[in-house]
A protein has these predicted regions:
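Cytoplasmic-side transmembrane-helix entry/capping segments in multi-pass membrane proteins
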Residues: 196-205
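Short, Lys/Arg-enriched, Gly/Pro-containing loop segments at transmembrane-helix junctions
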Residues: 118-125, 195-196, 258-263
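Cytosolic catalytic headpiece
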Residues: 1-12, 16-20, 62, 84-87, ...
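Hydrophobic alpha-helical transmembrane segments in multi-pass integral membrane proteins
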Residues: 152-156, 210-226
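Membrane-embedded transport module
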Residues: 1-3, 25-191
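Multi-pass alpha-helical transmembrane bundle typical of ion/small-solute transporters
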Residues: 121, 206-207, 238-241
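Alpha-helical transmembrane segments of multi-pass membrane proteins
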Residues: 100-104, 176-183, 211-218, 245-252
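Loop-to-transmembrane alpha-helix initiation sites
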Residues: 94-96, 203, 233-239
Length: 263
């Protein structure tokens, strides 16, 4: 990947042939500006560095949002597929799935799109121009997250099923949403989530508070419980929900550590 800067007529051929031609906005000639891909408005080379940093941040956030959306939806598919194959009653009803997809998936994904840049973002090698999004490492991460999410929700369903189908669905519903909160922190960083600034994304935290509030409203208010076909949980069942949800983060971080050590 080669970038070329120039401001004169004689620079036009090089600007045209470079992967990214950068012309000077103040001192550059019209010919150089026409030949370039980018015009540097302030003629400050430091702006190029900031532009590269911002471009990498946008690309990273796009990847994280896609990974989160696909992982959560595949996790739901794993849950429903296992239920069908094992001839269980449906672990989640259509209205519950609708709430999970519209509230639990979409809002956190939007918040990820405005996440801050990773600490090592400028020390990485550039992405190949012809490289697609669905690379082998990316596909592996999605599959891993989906299996983890599907596994903990299946566990919640089986535990709740010992009491009643209503309890099973309520626990599955809660674990599916709360697990996404913990999973999103693992997705934010390719390294350990402890290395990232935990409270740096205010939009993400605002989204988590909003989604958690709406979820608790649906689960605790009798009228909303009736609408969403949920039931009240005991304190022990709530602790199980919390433990399984945190288990997603623990398993995800362990898998990342294992992958880094192998690499």
């Amino acid at each position: 990947m080669l970038s070329m800067t120039g401001d004169g007529v004689n620079d036009a051929p090089a600007l045209k042939l470079a992967n990214i031609g950068v012309a000077m906005g103040i001192t550059g000639t019209d010919v150089s500006k026409e030949a370039a891909d980018v015009v540097l408005a302030d003629d400050n080379f430091a702006t190029i560095v900031q532009s590269v940093r911002e471009g990498r941040r946008i690309y990273d956030n796009l990847i994280k949002s896609i990974q989160f959306m696909i992982s959560t939806n595949l996790g739901e598919i794993v849950l429903l597929l296992v239920a069908v194959l094992c001839n269980f009653e449906m672990p989640l009803l259509p209205i519950q799935l609708l709430f999970i997809n519209l509230v639990g998936d979409s809002l956190p994904s939007l918040a990820l799109s405005v996440d801050h840049a990773a600490k090592n973002i400028m020390s990485r090698k550039p992405v190949e121009p012809n490289q697609g999004i669905f690379t082998k490492p990316f596909t592996t991460r999605i599959t891993r997250q989906a299996l983890i999410l599907g596994g903990v929700t299946i566990a919640a369903y089986l535990i709740g099923l010992q009491h009643s189908i209503e309890v099973a669905r309520t626990m599955t519903f809660a674990v599916m949403i709360f697990s996404q909160f913990t999973m999103i922190f693992s997705i934010r960083s390719g390294n350990s989530w402890f290395t990232e600034r935990f409270f740096s994304n205010r939009w993400l935290w605002a989204t988590i508070v909003l989604v958690m509030g709406l979820t608790l409203l649906v689960m605790l208010v009798p009228a909303m419980q009736s609408l969403f076909k949920l039931t009240a949980l005991t304190s022990i069942q709530w602790w199980i929900v919390a433990g399984l949800s945190l288990g997603v983060l623990v398993l995800s971080e362990f898998c990342k550590l294992f992958t880094r050590n192998n690499n």
